[in-house]
């Protein structure tokens, strides 16, 4: 319950609409509460032999009350339910926005399906509480107070007897609600698994097809889906029990009214019209009794859902601007001079250091080549520069500033990374390349074309029917591996970063294309600090400085010629690759 108090700021934002909705509830229920009295008066007049014009008056009055009540019921929903949708939108925006700023460590411990379930199911549960829950709570309270006041004014004794079954109705709904909550939680957990599995299969559909595992994955999915169906059926069994019980208890109340009310009519203390009004009022009280238990159920579902959302939104990113950030540092202050001082790093939940005591200087405008076996820490090293991760020990400086003091947006805007795995969005090629542009109106087509030429992509794009307006599939699935890498390169250089990092981003292209791209990149790399990670020495041999990472440390450092002369790890790799080339040529 306490978690729902966090919704108060959202309610304050829409307090005028909510208050107006509550006022409309009073008008609607007030008119609705008079309707049974009109029916009762009409029946009494009929027993006395009323005139035709009197019946018309009662009919018109009844119709007028229904129209009046219905109009305000419409206005209620236009205010309170609309507010619930607006709050739902605000919650979804805040949740999604918060997710964008969480650090990498958060995503390493959460599945995409689980996050998606929070963004759909949990927010939907909260919305049901904010809209129907609050609306029906006030309606139930108002209707109960007004109806009981009128019933007690007609006959306190009959009212008390008629109300005896109704609390049982609320109790049943409450108990059913409790069972519903427990089973709903199980449904939610399976739904999260179902979403995760779906997302995983569709993301890896190429692997599934290449290994001919379609039937296997379908069977695995069917098992989860069947479990989801079973849990939903268990939930439906509990919910279906409540409706027959509601009908039984409502019928019991009506029978009590007819029996005891009939005796009162014979005694002369009540009229037939009064008894008729009683029956209608009991019908009106039935919904509040049901709603009471249903509202408790909504609260029971919304409270844990809100808590799950809060568990995420209360997480503070471990990499963010803080009181030590120097807001005076601007992008114009970043020139690209980088220094690692005694930097060591290990991933969260791990005891093993991926990098140990790294000391490295990269001068502004120079190119650093990095080579080493798989798992030596190459990608980890470059991910420390834009603070995707923070160094466990030691410090990194850019132009004399500790990177922890540089505002994150300044730091990351100054760094352009082409990652190992090229991720492209389901959008046009132009928008993928110009991703760093603020809005569509900020996109410069000439720059998009120029950067695509540098990345060796322009000829390929021109062969597409829609050219740069070609819409890519999910993750750029319509492009080849090499085309995706080149699109990522074009995207990085479109940003015009002071520091350009290529993380093995030419591995999917042939050596001739690689050479062409590198020659084009030289034109823009002259004035930029560049870091190139590669497995092929041909990619980095012209770098100003090259380091060899092995077992988490820098084993060798120097130019291509110096490292070949050294006769160490670099030289061995170079000789093996030369031999491979000779074998290919042979």
Describe the role of every protein-language-model region.
Residues 2-3, 11, 43, 76, ...:
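Juxtamembrane loop-to-helix connectors within ABC transporter transmembrane domains
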Residues 12, 23, 31, 35, ...:
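Hydrophobic alpha-helical transmembrane segments of ABC transporter permease domains
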Residues 18-72, 79, 153-157, 268-272:
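Transmembrane helix-loop-helix hairpins at lipid-water interfaces of multipass membrane proteins
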Residues 48-54, 150-167, 173, 234, ...:
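Helix-loop-helix
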Residues 99, 221, 309, 340-342:
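Conserved catalytic Walker-motif region of ABC-type ATPase nucleotide-binding domains
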Residues 104-105, 121-130, 134, 138, ...:
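An intracellular "coupling" helix at the cytosolic face of ABC transporter transmembrane type-1 domains
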């Amino acid at each position: 319950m306490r978690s729902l108090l966090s919704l108060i700021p959202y309610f304050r934002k829409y307090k005028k609409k909510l208050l107006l909705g509550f006022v409309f509830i009073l008008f609607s229920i007030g008119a609705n509460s008079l309707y049974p009295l009109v029916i009762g008066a009409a029946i009494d007049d009929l027993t006395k032999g009323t005139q035709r014009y009197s019946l018309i008056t009662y009919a018109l009055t009844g119709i007028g009350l229904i129209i009046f009540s219905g109009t305000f019921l419409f206005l209620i929903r236009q205010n309170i339910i609309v507010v619930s949708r607006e709050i739902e939108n605000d919650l979804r925006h805040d949740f999604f926005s918060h997710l964008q700023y969480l650090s990498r460590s958060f995503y390493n411990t959460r599945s995409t399906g689980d996050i998606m379930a929070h963004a759909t199911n949990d927010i939907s549960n909260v919305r049901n509480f904010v809209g129907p829950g609050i609306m029906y709570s006030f309606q139930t309270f108002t209707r109960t107070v007004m109806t009981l006041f009128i019933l007690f004014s007609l006959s306190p004794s009959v009212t008390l007897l008629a109300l005896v079954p109704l609390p049982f109705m609320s109790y049943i709904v409450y108990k059913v609600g409790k069972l519903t909550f427990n089973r709903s939680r199980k449904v939610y957990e399976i739904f999260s698994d179902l979403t995760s599995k779906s997302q995983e299969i569709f993301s890896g559909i190429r692997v599934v097809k290449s290994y001919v595992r379609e039937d296997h994955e379908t069977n695995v999915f069917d098992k989860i889906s069947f479990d989801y169906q079973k849990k939903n059926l268990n939930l439906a069994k509990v919910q279906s029990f409540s409706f027959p019980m509601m009908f039984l208890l409502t019928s019991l109340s009506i029978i009590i009214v007819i029996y005891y009310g009939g005796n009162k009519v014979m005694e002369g203390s009540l009229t037939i019209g009064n008894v008729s009004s009683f029956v209608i009022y009991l019908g009106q009280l039935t919904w509040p009794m049901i709603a009471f238990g249903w509202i408790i159920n909504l609260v029971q579902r919304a409270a844990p859902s809100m808590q799950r959302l809060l568990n995420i939104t209360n997480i503070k990113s471990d990499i963010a601007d803080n009181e030590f950030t120097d807001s005076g540092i601007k992008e114009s202050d970043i020139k690209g001079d980088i220094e690692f001082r005694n930097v060591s790093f290990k991933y969260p939940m791990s005891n093993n250091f991926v990098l140990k005591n790294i000391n490295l200087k990269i001068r502004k405008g120079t190119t650093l080549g990095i080579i080493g076996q798989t798992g030596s820490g190459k990608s980890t090293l470059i991910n420390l520069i834009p603070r995707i991760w923070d160094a466990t020990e030691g410090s990194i400086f850019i132009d004399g500033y500790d990177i922890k003091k540089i505002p994150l947006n300044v730091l990351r805007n100054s760094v352009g990374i082409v990652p190992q795995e090229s991720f492209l969005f389901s959008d046009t090629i132009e928008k993928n390349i110009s991703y760093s542009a603020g809005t569509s109106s900020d996109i410069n087509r000439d720059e998009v074309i120029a950067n695509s030429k540098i990345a060796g992509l322009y000829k390929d794009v021109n062969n597409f029917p829609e050219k740069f307006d070609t819409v890519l599939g999910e993750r750029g699935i319509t492009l080849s591996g090499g085309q995706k890498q080149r699109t990522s390169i074009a995207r990085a250089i479109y940003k015009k970063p002071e520091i350009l990092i290529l993380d093995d981003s030419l591995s999917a292209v042939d050596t001739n294309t690689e050479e062409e791209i590198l020659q084009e990149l030289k034109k823009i790399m002259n004035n930029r600090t560049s870091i190139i990670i590669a497995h092929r020495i041909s990619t980095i041999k012209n770098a100003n400085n090259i380091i060899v990472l092995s077992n988490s440390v820098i084993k060798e450092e120097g130019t291509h010629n110096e490292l070949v002369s050294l006769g160490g790890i670099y030289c061995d790799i170079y000789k093996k690759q030369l031999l491979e080339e000779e074998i290919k040529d042979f």
